[in-house]
């Protein structure tokens, strides 16, 4: 079996990754950068975000300050690798979002964010079927269930259980807080538009913390967000307690 090791950029994690590499090779695994069967992630949820989007199964070692989804502790890595050899694991799948405009094509594990580029409010709309919801504030987040545990949680203090087939729309610091958050089915298509503010708006589009492009109102750009056909896959060897790691 071919393993790729993806490590958090910290001295402790890098040193631990050397130990894991030797351990895996001694157990008969082949370490590779290309076409792996499993990606072994050493870090926290931020490291996971950078490794998970290709849909290759993830073996995650909790080596970060906070991790809600990586459940293998460093002292259990040998046991996990031995279980991997014996195919004694389950695969947990997580939904991802796809966002497209004429200049943007991205996949997000946690969330898509539309945020101001300058220190002023964003005036726009979220369109779902025939329903148009206007908003003005710092922006809007479109989050998966696992994404509701992250940035969206900071704004709403609401957690969406991973088994709920929903998408959470969060309005960030709205001027008129008539709607703070909205949960819709994952089957819906979401269209985000910039509305007429009397001057050109230029806002950032952010996918899992990375700026992937801009929307400009004068060009009448729209961002379409749908459920991706691609699933993130995380291998489970032990029981993961829901929401464990979020508050510690």
From Swiss-Prot:
<keyword id="KW-0808">Transferase</keyword>
<dbReference type="GO" id="GO:0003951">
    <property type="term" value="F:NAD+ kinase activity"/>
</dbReference>
<dbReference type="GO" id="GO:0046872">
    <property type="term" value="F:metal ion binding"/>
</dbReference>
<dbReference type="InterPro" id="IPR016064">
    <property type="entry name" value="NAD/diacylglycerol_kinase_sf"/>
</dbReference>
<feature type="binding site">
    <location>
        <begin position="45"/>
        <end position="46"/>
    </location>
    <ligand>
        <name>NAD(+)</name>
    </ligand>
</feature>
<keyword id="KW-0067">ATP-binding</keyword>
<dbReference type="Pfam" id="PF20143">
    <property type="entry name" value="NAD_kinase_C"/>
</dbReference>
<feature type="active site" description="Proton acceptor">
    <location>
        <position position="45"/>
    </location>
</feature>
<dbReference type="Pfam" id="PF01513">
    <property type="entry name" value="NAD_kinase"/>
</dbReference>
<dbReference type="GO" id="GO:0005737">
    <property type="term" value="C:cytoplasm"/>
</dbReference>
<dbReference type="InterPro" id="IPR017437">
    <property type="entry name" value="ATP-NAD_kinase_PpnK-typ_C"/>
</dbReference>
<comment type="similarity">
    <text>Belongs to the NAD kinase family.</text>
</comment>
<keyword id="KW-0521">NADP</keyword>
<dbReference type="InterPro" id="IPR017438">
    <property type="entry name" value="ATP-NAD_kinase_N"/>
</dbReference>
<comment type="function">
    <text>Involved in the regulation of the intracellular balance of NAD and NADP, and is a key enzyme in the biosynthesis of NADP. Catalyzes specifically the phosphorylation on 2'-hydroxyl of the adenosine moiety of NAD to yield NADP.</text>
</comment>
<dbReference type="GO" id="GO:0006741">
    <property type="term" value="P:NADP biosynthetic process"/>
</dbReference>
<feature type="binding site">
    <location>
        <begin position="110"/>
        <end position="111"/>
    </location>
    <ligand>
        <name>NAD(+)</name>
    </ligand>
</feature>
<keyword id="KW-0520">NAD</keyword>
<feature type="binding site">
    <location>
        <position position="50"/>
    </location>
    <ligand>
        <name>NAD(+)</name>
    </ligand>
</feature>
<dbReference type="GO" id="GO:0019674">
    <property type="term" value="P:NAD metabolic process"/>
</dbReference>
<keyword id="KW-0963">Cytoplasm</keyword>
<dbReference type="InterPro" id="IPR002504">
    <property type="entry name" value="NADK"/>
</dbReference>
<dbReference type="GO" id="GO:0005524">
    <property type="term" value="F:ATP binding"/>
</dbReference>
<keyword id="KW-0418">Kinase</keyword>
<protein>
    <recommendedName>
        <fullName>NAD kinase</fullName>
        <ecNumber>2.7.1.23</ecNumber>
    </recommendedName>
</protein>
<feature type="binding site">
    <location>
        <position position="138"/>
    </location>
    <ligand>
        <name>NAD(+)</name>
    </ligand>
</feature>
<keyword id="KW-0547">Nucleotide-binding</keyword>
